[in-house]
Amino acid sequence: MYNYWEPVHLLTQTHGKDTAFETWEYVPQYAIRSWAYAAMHAIVPYLITRVSSLPPYAAFYALRFVLAVLSSVSDALLYEQVARHVHVRVARYLLVFLTVCAGMLSASTALLPSSFVMYTTSLAMAFAMQPASTQAWRRTFYTTAVFAFGALAGWPYAIILAAPYVYEELCLCGSDPSCEHT
């Protein structure tokens, strides 16, 4: 988590070279990581440090709060869609597992690409739970866009998580009665 906080801190704390952190992965000499992920997360700390008179460490906690809200919203949407389109009992089990799993709690506020992919995967799966025939193009577009955004902005290897959805769209057509492939 803190390895990604350092470039965010560098982007938001521009008081001088002595106050900002910099890691070797982001130095132009090596440049093995993209600044896009850090820049995307630097918006909240930047606004906190510029708009308020709070100390710089408040930006750290504000960003973690925003990450917790994103995780909670994506998991709540997934729970709602599982309850609506799968079964209420399955949704209750999902809720229990999401609530008591220590790894999920720890990952929900971590500034890591894998945690970001966790949010986008939960959100994409919430869209994918909707029956294919009820949302027409929106289900396909939103699910594909969120899976792609998670892979492009977070962790590229996470695109494999979309494989079951892609298989359903291409081969099974969900529950769409007008599907010509069946």
Language model features: what each stretch is:
Residues 106-117:
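Short acidic/glycine- and proline-prone juxtamembrane loop motifs at membrane-interface regions
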Residues 31, 35-39, 50-73, 107:
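Loop-to-helix entry region of an early transmembrane alpha helix in multi-pass inner-membrane enzymes
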Residues 94-102, 147, 151:
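Short helix- or helix-capping micro-motifs
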Residues 2-29, 36, 40-51:
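Extracytosolic helix-loop segments that constitute the early lumenal/periplasmic catalytic or substrate-binding loops
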Residues 61-89, 123:
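Transmembrane-helix motifs of polytopic, lipid-linked glycan transferases
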Residues 126-149, 156-182:
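Perimembrane helix-loop-helix junctions
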Residues 41, 45-49, 75-83, 102-105, ...:
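Hydrophobic transmembrane alpha-helices
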Residues 4, 10-13, 71, 75, ...:
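Hydrophobic core segments of transmembrane alpha-helices in multi-pass, intramembrane catalytic enzymes
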